Amino acid sequence: VGSEMCIRDRHGVICSDMPWCYYKNTKMRLFVCGAQKEYEFIRDTYGYPKNYVKYLGLTRFDGLHDFKVKENQILVMPSWREWIATPTSKSKNFDDVSDFKKTEYYQQWNNFLNSEKIKETLEKHDLQMIFYPHRNMQKYLKEFHPKSDRITIADWRKYDVQGLLKESAFLITDLSSIFMDFGYMRKPMLYFQFDMKKFREGQYQQGYFEYKRDGFGPVCEKLEEVEQELEKAAANQLQNDVEYLRREEAFFPLWDSDNCKRNYEAIKEI
């Protein structure tokens, strides 16, 4: 009587190391995982008592089996940067747009949106692209001006994230965990990771997931590589590569519409 029980059903699969999720910091009775390797990592390193961590699948995965893909739609979803979006007293304040425009983040993504080669690929293969940055970066949305009229800048107030993930045929992201949802649906993608070293030092540290070894698509560090990989994917009608499909299937051995049911039953048993 009077005791509280904490159960965690997260919004995404963890792939980096996140110390605030350690048992000593959460005291959670049930930590629900969405993937086998994630489960093994948290079980073995986060300090939870036996059977407190379970691989049940995230409840929202139940909604990722019934979808209709727009075959020519590419979704671009960059993640956020803590040192830009949530400045501390020790870091730069980027409320000034001119300061934001000096960041590598802005310059890289703006160059991406204004790439002549990407514009040509979209036109050549009759593709549409939706650029939807992380919610924390949306305050800078008006600063992005794509060269192609085939690229839509998406305001979070007008688009449903899960809807975009379900209907899009191909994903481009950097480090956003939404790639896990895309991979769960067995879809193709590529990563544009131009600032990985700074990201690891200033935001999330390396976890169990190594993008070049475990990722669900090619890892690009330069815009030229993105241009080449996107043209290659478009020429292949945005079909998934056999190797990346195999990785996706192996990463999510639980692949059904019983995620909510498993979570419900696990909670009842506590």
Q: Where is each model-derived feature located?
A:
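C-terminal alpha-helical cap of glycosyltransferases
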Residues: 256-270
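Short, small-residue-biased leader/transition segments that mark boundaries at the very start
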Residues: 1-7
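Membrane-proximal helix-turn-helix segments that form the acceptor-binding/catalytic region
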Residues: 16-30, 116
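Helix-loop-beta element that forms the nucleotide-linked donor phosphate-binding surface
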Residues: 40-58
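A short beta-strand/loop micro-motif in the catalytic core of glycosyltransferases
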Residues: 29-35, 130, 171-172
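Conserved catalytic-core segment of nucleotide-activated headgroup transferases in glycan assembly
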Residues: 59-143, 220, 255
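Donor nucleotide-activated moiety binding/catalytic core segment of transferases
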Residues: 135-180
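Catalytic binding pocket for nucleotide-activated donors in carbohydrate/polymer assembly enzymes
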Residues: 49-50, 143-148, 175-251
